[in-house]
Regions:
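Nuclease catalytic cores that cleave nucleic-acid phosphodiester bonds
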Residues: 2-168
């Protein structure tokens, strides 16, 4: 059975993910460190809370062993997205962008280059402020993922959720 895992550390769409998953009777696991207040979700049917010790990537390393092919992961973390894709999960950002295995290596390379640049004293731009359009896009893409089910199994490729190239 598909499960929706939410990297709930500062996730702006936790409630949306729970509502969409519950509407399809899909269980949800919220994973966050102890500094996040997840008590508001305690006791909700179909919602499990996994709180981990504070620490860099501790939520990621607690989540990955629990992932199964076909699960859906909600995260804005490219590293966690790569690990989830390697376990044949579908991965969506809180802004509604699906991470794809075909390009995750390039995204990791960009992330690494930006980290090196910052360590050397350089500056990089952060993400733009979260907008209502981001939330709507997230809802649409997650709803599509849950409606279509997930594709699992060796060599399976999930259906694309991006529009692909535009024809003129």
């Amino acid at each position: 059975m598909t499960t929706v895992f939410v990297d709930a550390d500062a996730c702006p769409v936790t409630r949306d993910a729970i509502a969409l998953a519950r509407s399809r009777s899909v269980p949800v696991v919220l994973v966050a460190n102890h500094s996040q207040n997840l008590a508001q979700y305690a006791g909700r049917s179909g919602v499990e809370i996994l709180q981990v010790a504070s620490g860099r990537d501790s939520a990621d390393f607690a989540m990955v062993p629990r992932l199964s092919p076909g699960d859906v992961v909600v995260t804005g973390d490219t590293g966690l997205a790569a690990m989830a894709l390697s376990r044949r999960c579908r991965v969506i950002s809180p802004r509604g962008r699906e991470y794809l295995a075909a390009v995750i290596d390039a995204e990791l390379a960009v992330r690494h280059a930006e980290q090196r640049h910052r360590r050397a004293g350089g500056r990089t731009t952060g993400p733009s402020p979260f907008q209502p359009e981001d939330r709507e896009r997230f809802r649409e893409v997650l709803a599509r993922m849950l409606a279509a089910g997930t594709v699992a199994g060796p060599g399976a490729t999930p259906p694309r959720t991006d529009p692909g190239p535009l024809n003129s």
